[in-house]
């Protein structure tokens, strides 16, 4: 009984081994047969080389028609007249200016409260989050225990206008105004101090408050 069982197991093992050997060889042979081309590719198998303008063959009547009927000229005139009656795509800058998004990131500014007190609490989150290390802050404690900045400098030549300072500020003190026209003649004029930033905030406060209100539902 044991001998019969052992012989049966050996036969099954031989069959499995044979199948494992046959299956890969059959598959590989089939792939090799169908993957190898039997002959040259058919005509037009590859994309032909595009012809140049001097190699294109055109009928004589087509050439004469384009020459005498001036079809290309009338086609260009039609395009010009079509664009003439459409509204213009351009504006007369700087006399006309396009709309600006409330999220536009322009010149920096420091805001105040309606009472005139500056908003910045010298938490230095903007200085820490600035990837360009363009912000420098120094602060001191007041008699009432509150902290206020004694120095707030921004090197506008380093700023990448990412808006991280504005997003990190817990009191909406440092913001980026909608002003994009602050080109200067010297590099020193782009080194903003606290007084310059506060004056920008006083100048653009109505626009800044409106932009913050428009963006408040999404914050």
Curated annotation (Swiss-Prot):
<feature type="domain" description="4Fe-4S ferredoxin-type 2">
    <location>
        <begin position="150"/>
        <end position="179"/>
    </location>
</feature>
<feature type="binding site">
    <location>
        <position position="120"/>
    </location>
    <ligand>
        <name>[4Fe-4S] cluster 1</name>
    </ligand>
</feature>
<dbReference type="GO" id="GO:0008137">
    <property type="term" value="F:NADH dehydrogenase (ubiquinone) activity"/>
</dbReference>
<feature type="binding site">
    <location>
        <position position="123"/>
    </location>
    <ligand>
        <name>[4Fe-4S] cluster 1</name>
    </ligand>
</feature>
<feature type="binding site">
    <location>
        <position position="130"/>
    </location>
    <ligand>
        <name>[4Fe-4S] cluster 2</name>
    </ligand>
</feature>
<dbReference type="InterPro" id="IPR017896">
    <property type="entry name" value="4Fe4S_Fe-S-bd"/>
</dbReference>
<dbReference type="GO" id="GO:0051539">
    <property type="term" value="F:4 iron, 4 sulfur cluster binding"/>
</dbReference>
<feature type="domain" description="4Fe-4S ferredoxin-type 1">
    <location>
        <begin position="111"/>
        <end position="140"/>
    </location>
</feature>
<keyword id="KW-0830">Ubiquinone</keyword>
<comment type="similarity">
    <text>Belongs to the complex I 23 kDa subunit family.</text>
</comment>
<keyword id="KW-0520">NAD</keyword>
<feature type="binding site">
    <location>
        <position position="126"/>
    </location>
    <ligand>
        <name>[4Fe-4S] cluster 1</name>
    </ligand>
</feature>
<keyword id="KW-1278">Translocase</keyword>
<feature type="binding site">
    <location>
        <position position="162"/>
    </location>
    <ligand>
        <name>[4Fe-4S] cluster 2</name>
    </ligand>
</feature>
<feature type="binding site">
    <location>
        <position position="165"/>
    </location>
    <ligand>
        <name>[4Fe-4S] cluster 2</name>
    </ligand>
</feature>
<keyword id="KW-0679">Respiratory chain</keyword>
<dbReference type="GO" id="GO:0032981">
    <property type="term" value="P:mitochondrial respiratory chain complex I assembly"/>
</dbReference>
<keyword id="KW-0809">Transit peptide</keyword>
<comment type="subunit">
    <text>Complex I is composed of about 40 different subunits.</text>
</comment>
<keyword id="KW-0249">Electron transport</keyword>
<comment type="function">
    <text>Core subunit of the mitochondrial membrane respiratory chain NADH dehydrogenase (Complex I) that is believed to belong to the minimal assembly required for catalysis. Complex I functions in the transfer of electrons from NADH to the respiratory chain. The immediate electron acceptor for the enzyme is believed to be ubiquinone. May donate electrons to ubiquinone.</text>
</comment>
<keyword id="KW-0004">4Fe-4S</keyword>
<dbReference type="GO" id="GO:0045271">
    <property type="term" value="C:respiratory chain complex I"/>
</dbReference>
<dbReference type="Pfam" id="PF12838">
    <property type="entry name" value="Fer4_7"/>
</dbReference>
<feature type="binding site">
    <location>
        <position position="159"/>
    </location>
    <ligand>
        <name>[4Fe-4S] cluster 2</name>
    </ligand>
</feature>
<keyword id="KW-0813">Transport</keyword>
<keyword id="KW-0411">Iron-sulfur</keyword>
<keyword id="KW-0479">Metal-binding</keyword>
<keyword id="KW-0677">Repeat</keyword>
<dbReference type="GO" id="GO:0006120">
    <property type="term" value="P:mitochondrial electron transport, NADH to ubiquinone"/>
</dbReference>
<protein>
    <recommendedName>
        <fullName>NADH-ubiquinone oxidoreductase 23 kDa subunit, mitochondrial</fullName>
        <ecNumber>7.1.1.2</ecNumber>
    </recommendedName>
</protein>
<dbReference type="GO" id="GO:0046872">
    <property type="term" value="F:metal ion binding"/>
</dbReference>
<dbReference type="InterPro" id="IPR010226">
    <property type="entry name" value="NADH_quinone_OxRdtase_chainI"/>
</dbReference>
<dbReference type="InterPro" id="IPR017900">
    <property type="entry name" value="4Fe4S_Fe_S_CS"/>
</dbReference>
<keyword id="KW-0408">Iron</keyword>
<dbReference type="GO" id="GO:0005739">
    <property type="term" value="C:mitochondrion"/>
</dbReference>
<feature type="binding site">
    <location>
        <position position="169"/>
    </location>
    <ligand>
        <name>[4Fe-4S] cluster 1</name>
    </ligand>
</feature>
<keyword id="KW-0496">Mitochondrion</keyword>
<keyword id="KW-0560">Oxidoreductase</keyword>
């Amino acid at each position: 009984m044991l001998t019969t069982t052992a012989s049966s197991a050996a036969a099954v093992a031989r069959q499995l081994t044979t199948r494992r050997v046959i299956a890969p060889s059959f598959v590989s042979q089939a792939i090799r047969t169908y993957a190898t081309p039997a002959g040259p590719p058919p005509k037009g198998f590859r994309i032909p080389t595009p012809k140049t303008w001097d190699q294109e063959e055109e009928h004589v009547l087509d050439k004469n028609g384009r020459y005498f009927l001036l079809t290309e000229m009338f086609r260009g005139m039609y395009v010009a007249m079509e664009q003439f009656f459409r509204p213009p795509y351009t504006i007369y800058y700087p006399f006309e200016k396009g709309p600006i998004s409330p999220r536009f990131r322009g010149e920096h500014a420091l805001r105040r409260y309606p009472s005139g007190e500056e908003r910045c609490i010298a938490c230095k989150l903007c200085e820490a989050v600035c990837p360009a290390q363009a912000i420098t802050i120094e602060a001191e404690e007041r008699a009432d225990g509150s902290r206020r900045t004694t120095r707030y400098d921004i090197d506008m030549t380093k700023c990448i206008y990412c808006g991280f300072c504005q997003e990190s500020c817990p009191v909406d003190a440092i913001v980026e105004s909608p002003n994009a026209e602050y080109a200067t003649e010297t590099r020193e004029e782009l080194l903003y101090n606290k007084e310059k930033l506060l004056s920008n905030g006083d100048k653009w406060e109505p626009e800044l408050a409106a932009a913050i209100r428009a963006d408040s539902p999404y914050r």
